[in-house]
Design a protein with these regions (language model features):
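A general structural signal marking secondary-structure boundaries and capping sites
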Residues: 72, 170, 183-186
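Flexible loop/hinge segments that line or gate small-molecule binding clefts
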Residues: 158
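Conserved alpha-helical substructure of the radical SAM core
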Residues: 29-150, 161, 165-166, 173-177
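Conserved phosphate-donor/acceptor-positioning beta-strand/loop module used by diverse small-molecule
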Residues: 153-155
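Conserved strand-turn element in the central/C-terminal portion of the radical SAM core barrel
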Residues: 126, 130, 179-197
Length: 197
């Protein structure tokens, strides 16, 4: 784990000079040959942990958008357990911003809002992307009360025909209703959730 590897390292370790190798035309394709032109650059042996992370909580989606390859993945697609998510947060103690997104639809994950709450409770600014097809009233309420800072809604078309030609398996009217519900719920609860399109 990241934490295990870094546990014994001092944050004030000295920087070291390492060779920078240039591409070369030495005829034999050995462009990593140390006898080739090099100079020294200073590199910190213990770079700081990231302040931003993007995590894919789930690797599947309820749509079949024309431009997306999620339904053609050959890797094992599943969902991240809440324990694994908590472990990742533990390994990234300096995290300031977290974006929950990948190829999958984050709101398909049964513990999506729990993940947001876990991260937000640590002072992490959490954002996510969504196709907004899965937003009954109870989920709209969770959206504005769980600590989510920003939600980007993917709407690829201003008309029903264009949208549904791109976002296959989605209903334009349903997404517009869900967006309206989200905005009304946000106003009712005076939520600071940023909603972006």
């Amino acid at each position: 784990s990241v934490a295990t590897r870094l546990a014994g390292q001092r944050r004030t370790s000295p920087a070291v000079a390492v060779p920078r190798h240039y591409r070369c035309n030495d005829g034999n394709g050995d462009c990593r040959n140390p006898s080739m032109k090099t100079d020294n650059v200073v590199v910190d042996e213990n770079p700081p942990l990231p302040r931003f992370a993007q995590i894919e909580p789930i690797g599947r989606c309820n749509l079949a958008c024309r431009m997306c390859t999620v339904n053609e993945r050959i890797d094992a697609v599943g969902e991240m357990s809440i324990d694994r998510f908590r472990s990742l947060l533990d390994q990234l103690p300096g995290l300031e911003t977290l974006h929950l997104q990948g190829l999958g639809e984050p709101m398909l994950h049964p513990a999506f809002f729990d993940m947001v709450e876990l991260a937000a409770a640590r002072g992490i600014r959490v954002s996510a992307n969504t196709n907004l097809t899965l937003l009954p009233p109870a989920r709209a309420l969770r959206c504005v009360t769980c600590g989510l800072a920003s939600l980007s809604v993917s709407i690829d078309g201003a008309s029903r025909e264009v949208y549904q030609a791109i976002r296959r398996k989605a209903s334009f009217d349903k997404v517009v209703r869900n967006l309206d519900r989200l905005m009304r719920t946000r106003a009712e609860h005076r939520s600071r959730l940023e909603v972006r399109g």
